[in-house]
């Protein structure tokens, strides 16, 4: 470039140029410049490592950090925010959250038998026993199962220093120290002869609030082992369980547990201990004879259906197993014949070496005392009181050899070790169950007859009665167990026919399924199958008939119980009856989320908790209030814990607990009540009157059933309740369902009413009657103990004018009007309370009960014990906090349990408008009915008083005016 053509500032000062030359020169310069730049770039590329920083980079092009895409890759989405939108309470990166509510084994523990052997036993139904262990609270059921677990799992006790409580798998059960859920355990146990049996054992809660869990276990069992504390004897729940087992038609055996308490705690002489044990057996037999019609159902140690145990010290024996210890020690003894002489008023004469029914001398002891109790007393006394001197010699005589380290153990573990070596395995328990509890093959037929709604004589019924593993699949599930994280459920039940396979398509029939209405059914695919052993599960590919099984993948359509069958080719299959509980859920709480936007989470939690607890009821009131009904305070406390922590994980507000009420009448309707249909073409006339005492309970307990033929039904009511035969044969329905405590009777005369026309609308009238008795007029609660009589009916000739839309609401209205004309009253639930307390605390118990409208019915000492048992009744609405109040007044020495017992009329007239309910003031007794009704109606979003305009037609009101009937109801 010529420098003369440019000044010092680079401006062109030369001659003018032509535009073409200009462009050519500019193009050449640009081309040269581009080539130079390319060469420079290549040069930089070659030498940039040698001379970093020599290149010129503009400020805006400088790159100090790698981009997010270069760091994380193109698949990762990066978001840049200049403002923090997360609250401080929420972490920027949420930690991985794991939910675990159950205590489960991480791997399969070592057992004394092979798992393949267990699986092989499942195919032989004659070697299977399905047993439920039940009993009163803290009578030793769980501890007994621990002994069986120790016997079959040699390494488990080494990992647990304290009480094992192997079947308390929920953390809440461990914390509370009380069983909440029924837990199945499947183990292989040998009998005295060494023959192995597969035992499916259900460990059930002892608290009376959780008796619904016992019901679920009994339904799939063939027999019951009833645990009774030797010191406490027969208690509240013991009696209820005996009645329940007899009603379920199960074989009953007894295990008298904690016999060590008679020796170490009560310090009874051996003879008194025998009397105590005999008293328990006699008391149980008395209860069985009260509830059972089977005269052969007798419990006696001589028959082998009573065993004795002390779970804490690993003691378990029957007369036969103890006699075998003598036979093994001394030889040449027929232990079976020897066992027959070890109970009752039988004495051993050492001179003649024979047993006699008469005492040889005044100092002679009964054979049970001499051969069983005295050796047991000596063993316990030696270990407890004389460890250092004579114990080793005594143990050598018994053939028990302990090391020096074992002899230095503390008293309890040493005593447990000695007893374990002396008594050996729990073969006596196995003998008792094998002999007196039927196998699934033998027990199937009576169970099917009792629980199956279909015909027993059908092909399907015969397959179930034969426990046929090759027959059509029929499985009855009675329990739902949630997974460790509480997200899903597994169904637990018993295979009654056929074989269920993993991955098999099945048809799940719900509780409302019928052959006419198949809506409550769904096709599902079975996931995995397990055999449950409390804290671990054994996965299997198939489970044949007669066994218990835990099923994955079928939980979605199941609410409480279900029937699982094949999806095709089994169309005549019907359901098993839903569980019938021996208690009633009468305690009610209302719940709502603290944050209203979390309502869907709470609803999902309510659905899950409803599956988890068999007798729990959830419903929505007309006001939109979500209500939970349970059996007691502890029950609802556990429900709310699971709802908050396990299933919904939200904060939930709970209203003060209340109770459900019932509505009844105490007189006959003061006049005939009638109602016309909206089209004025039909008219129904009815009256209401109280039922005879005890009839409502007979209907609820299915002593009488509406499905009986008219002749049988008529004979029952005529003989037991002195009904007129015509009226007894004219019963149309029970209400509000087939076991409802109300009756609808057709009391019309053929000369006055067209029976054919009346029969054409029978179903509609029954439906209206059941609707009305389900929600009474006082406070939308169940009507109870009322008989409704149809006295007259005018029915339209044309079918169009007598449809269900006309008849059903009219029948409901006339039910209400007849009810209101019969002096309506409220009924409240009463609890039966059993209190254990020392003698000096009995007066305090009376005081606490009197303050809560309760009254004592029985006050007696427990035989052979320093404690008293006080039995009483208390209104459920006044029972909240009763247990805490009782312990406060007795310095923690009294212990109580309460359970629903009966309904009782609340004092006062609920429709007396002269009563003024003052806020924050306790009401006198005559005002209680009015207070309960008004507050219940307010809670449900109803008007404070009953409006008769809803239930009485204008002609009826005119009739009331003519009769000069005084009404307390607002118009």
Swiss-Prot record:
Chain intervals for the UniProt region annotation (Disordered): 1-52
Record PROSITE patterns: G_TR_2
Localization annotation: Nucleus
Swiss-Prot/TrEMBL keywords: Acetylation, GTP-binding, Isopeptide bond, mRNA processing, mRNA splicing, Nucleotide-binding, Nucleus, Phosphoprotein, Spliceosome, Ubl conjugation
A GO BP annotation: mRNA splicing, via spliceosome
Residues annotated for GTP binding in this entry: 135-142, 203-207, 257-260
Cross-link entry Glycyl lysine isopeptide (Lys-Gly) (interchain with G-Cter in SUMO1), positions: 63
Modified residues (Phosphoserine): 19
TM region(s), chain numbering: none
Cellular component terms per the entry's GO annotation: nucleus; U2-type catalytic step 2 spliceosome; U2-type precatalytic spliceosome
Family matches, as Pfam families: EFG_C, EFG_III, EFG_IV, EFTUD2, GTP_EFTU, GTP_EFTU_D2
Domain tr-type G: 126-408
Any one GO MF annotation of this record: GTP binding
Domain of life: Eukaryota
Subunit-structure text: Component of the U5 snRNP and the U4/U6-U5 tri-snRNP complex, a building block of the spliceosome. The U4/U6-U5 tri-snRNP complex is composed of the U4, U6 and U5 snRNAs and at least PRPF3, PRPF4, PRPF6, PRPF8, PRPF31, SNRNP200, TXNL4A, SNRNP40, DDX23, CD2BP2, PPIH, SNU13, EFTUD2, SART1 and USP39. Component of the pre-catalytic, catalytic and post-catalytic spliceosome complexes. Component of the minor spliceosome, which splices U12-type introns. Within this complex, interacts with CRIPT. Interacts with ERBB4 and PRPF8. Interacts with PIH1D1.
NCBIfam families reported for this sequence: small_GTP
Described function: Required for pre-mRNA splicing as component of the spliceosome, including pre-catalytic, catalytic and post-catalytic spliceosomal complexes. Component of the U5 snRNP and the U4/U6-U5 tri-snRNP complex, a building block of the spliceosome. As a component of the minor spliceosome, involved in the splicing of U12-type introns in pre-mRNAs.
Entry similarity comment: Belongs to the TRAFAC class translation factor GTPase superfamily. Classic translation factor GTPase family. EF-G/EF-2 subfamily.
Protein name: 116 kDa U5 small nuclear ribonucleoprotein component
Organism: Mus musculus (Mouse)
Gene coding for it: Eftud2
